[in-house]
Regions:
Chain A
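Selective transmembrane-helix segments that form parts of the transport pathway or gating/packing helices
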Residues: 87-114
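Junction motif at the cytosolic side of a transmembrane helix
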Residues: 200-216
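A structural motif at transmembrane helix-loop-helix junctions in multipass membrane proteins
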Residues: 121, 130-162, 215-216
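Short helix-to-coil transition segments within interhelical loops
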Residues: 80-88
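Long, hydrophobic alpha-helical segments
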Residues: 49-66
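Transmembrane helix boundary and interhelical loop/hinge segments in multi-pass membrane proteins
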Residues: 13, 62-80
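Transmembrane helix segments
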Residues: 145-191, 195-197
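Aromatic- and glycine-rich beta-strand/loop motifs that create alpha-glucan
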Residues: 1-23
C-alpha cells in the first residue's frame, strides 16, 4: 500500500473546498427545512426525523461523491494509476478520503440535529455511530454508481445504486424503532458493521474493474 | 465431443441457426399450452369459497411473479458465463432478458394490484413481497437504461453483467430485509404466505400454467436474443448473407 497516494488524494479533495464543505452545507440546509415543513413542537414520533435524516444523508452523500472519479478520469490521472497497477489502492483511498471529509462531518451535523430534538443522548450517539458506518456503505455504492455512469450524469448512477442500498435503509429503520422501544441494538449494529466490512473490502475491486473497462 | 458441441453452440452463428429452426415452434407450442392452462383454470375449476371467482387471476399472477425472479437469476447465470468465459452469446442473451423481465415483473405487480382490490380491499400494500417485487422492477429498468446509455456496446455488456451479479446477490438480501421490516410494521393477515394450502383441483391447472408460462417466456427470450444477435453482429458476413 502506497501511503503517498492517500496524502495526494486527501490533499486534492481538501483543496477543492466546495467539494466537501458544499455537501455538508447542503445537508445543513435540508435539515433546517425539516422544522419549517413539519411542526417540530407537536408530538410527532422522533422516528420521523430519524428516517428523514437517513434519506437525506443518502442523497447528500450521493451529491458529495458525484465528481469522485470524473476529474481524474478526464485529465488522465486514473490512466497513470492503471498503468502502474495501483488502481485498487486509488479507489480505496478515494473512498476513504470522501468518508473522512464528507461522510463523518455529515454524521456529526445530523447528530447535533438529533440532540436538538430532545432525543436521549444514548439514542443520539447510537444514531451517530450508525450514520458513520452507513455513510461508508453509501459512499462505496455511490462511487460504484458514479464509476459506471462516468460522463453520463449522476441520475443513472442513482437509479442503479439506490436499490442496492434499500437493505441498509431497512436495517437503519429497524434500528431506530428498536432504539426508541429500548431494545438491544447489538445485533443490528454488528450486522451493519459486517455489511460495512464486506462492502468496503469488495466494492473497490468492482470499481477498479469498471474503471479499467472505461480506460480500455 | 461435448466440448466441440459447446464451442459450436456458443458461437452466435450456429445458435442463431438452431434458434431460427426451433424458436418459433417452441414459442407457439407453449403459447397454446398456456392458453389451454388459462381455459382450464378459468372455465373448468370451481370458484373459491372465500374469494369467489376473483381468485382465477392466480393463473396469470403466480407464473408472472415466479418468472420475475427466475429471469433475474437466469440473467445472472448468463452474465457470469459472459464474464468468466467471455462468450459474447451469453451477453446477448442476458441483455435480451432484461426488457422481458421488466415486462413480466410489471405484469406481476399489475395483476397483483387487480387481485388486491376484491380480496384485500386495496390495490397496494407495502408488504414484503410487493415491495421487493417493485424494487426488482426498478432494478430491471436501471439495467436497461445502463445498457442503453453506452455507445460502445462491448463496454455496456461488461458493466451490465457486473451489475447483474451484484444485483442477484442483493435479491435474497432485499427479500429477507423487507421481511424483517414488515414483520414489525404489519399484521400477518394480508401476506400471501399464510394462505391455506391450495386444493388439488386448483393446484393442477396452476402448475400447468406455471410450466407453460416458463416455456412461453423462454421462447420469447430466444426470439429476442436472435433479434439482439442480428442487431449487434450486423456487419458480420454471415448476417449479411441471411
Amino acid at each position: 500500500m502506497d501511503r503517498d497516494i492517500l496524502y495526494i488524494e486527501m490533499y486534492k479533495l481538501f483543496k477543492r473546498r466546495r467539494a466537501w464543505i458544499g455537501p455538508v452545507l447542503v445537508f445543513l440546509l435540508i435539515i433546517i427545512s425539516f422544522p419549517l415543513t413539519l411542526d417540530i413542537n407537536s408530538d410527532n414520533p422522533p422516528q420521523i426525523y430519524l428516517s428523514f435524516i437517513w434519506i437525506s444523508t443518502l442523497l447528500v452523500t450521493m451529491l458529495g461523491t458525484e465528481l469522485i472519479f470524473s476529474d481524474d478520469f478526464e485529465d488522465g490521472t486514473l490512466e497513470q494509476y492503471a498503468v502502474n497497477d495501483q488502481l485498487i489502492e486509488v479507489v480505496f483511498y478515494k473512498i476513504l478520503v470522501h468518508w473522512v471529509l464528507i461522510g463523518i462531518p455529515l454524521a456529526f451535523v445530523a447528530f447535533l440535529f438529533i440532540l436538538s430534538l430532545n432525543i436521549s443522548i444514548q439514542i443520539s450517539s447510537i444514531a451517530l455511530l450508525c450514520l458513520i458506518i452507513s455513510n461508508l456503505i453509501f459512499i462505496n455504492f455511490f462511487s460504484l454508481g458514479n464509476a459506471l455512469s462516468l460522463k453520463k450524469g449522476s441520475i443513472l448512477g442513482l437509479l442503479i445504486t439506490i436499490p442496492f442500498l434499500i437493505p441498509v435503509l431497512i436495517v437503519l429503520g429497524k434500528m431506530t424503532t428498536s432504539a426508541l422501544l429500548g431494545l438491544s441494538l447489538v445485533g443490528h449494529l454488528s450486522l451493519l458493521v459486517g455489511v460495512m466490512i464486506l462492502v468496503a473490502s469488495f466494492i473497490p475491486f468492482v470499481i477498479s474493474f469498471i474503471l479499467r473497462t472505461h480506460l480500455e | 465431443m461435448i466440448k466441440k458441441f459447446f464451442h459450436q453452440f456458443a458461437s452466435p452463428k450456429s445458435y442463431f441457426a438452431i434458434a431460427n429452426k426451433f424458436g418459433k415452434p417452441v414459442l407457439a407450442f407453449f403459447f397454446l399450452l398456456y392458453i389451454g392452462a388459462l381455459v382450464w383454470g378459468l372455465f373448468f375449476t370451481p370458484p373459491d369459497v372465500v374469494q369467489g371467482d376473483s381468485y382465477r387471476i392466480i393463473y396469470m399472477h403466480v407464473p408472472a411473479s415466479f418468472m420475475a425472479q427466475i429471469l433475474f437469476v437466469v440473467m445472472a447465470i448468463t452474465s457470469a458465463v459472459f464474464l468468466i468465459w467471455k462468450l459474447k452469446l451469453a451477453a446477448y442473451v442476458s441483455k435480451s432478458i432484461a426488457p422481458i423481465g421488466a415486462i413480466v415483473t410489471f405484469f406481476a405487480l399489475f395483476s397483483g394490484s387487480i387481485w388486491g382490490i376484491p380480496t384485500w380491499g386495496t390495490w397496494w400494500q407495502w408488504d414484503a413481497r410487493i415491495t421487493s417485487t417493485l424494487i426488482l422492477f426498478i432494478m430491471y429498468l436501471g439495467l436497461i437504461s445502463l445498457h442503453a446509455s453506452f455507445e460502445n456496446k462491448d463496454k455496456a455488456d461488461k458493466f451490465f453483467s457486473v451489475l447483474v451479479l451484484i444485483g442477484v446477490v442483493n435479491i435474497p438480501v432485499i427479500k429477507k430485509s423487507v421481511d424483517w421490516w414488515s414483520t414489525l410494521h404489519q399484521s400477518a393477515s394480508i401476506t400471501l404466505t399464510s394462505k391455506p394450502a391450495i386444493d388439488p383441483v386448483m393446484l393442477y391447472p396452476l402448475m400447468f400454467s406455471i410450466v407453460a408460462f416458463i416455456g412461453l417466456i423462454f421462447g420469447l427470450v430466444i426470439l429476442s436474443s436472435q433479434n439482439e444477435i442480428l442487431k449487434r453482429e450486423k456487419y458480420k458476413s454471415w448476417v449479411k448473407n441471411i
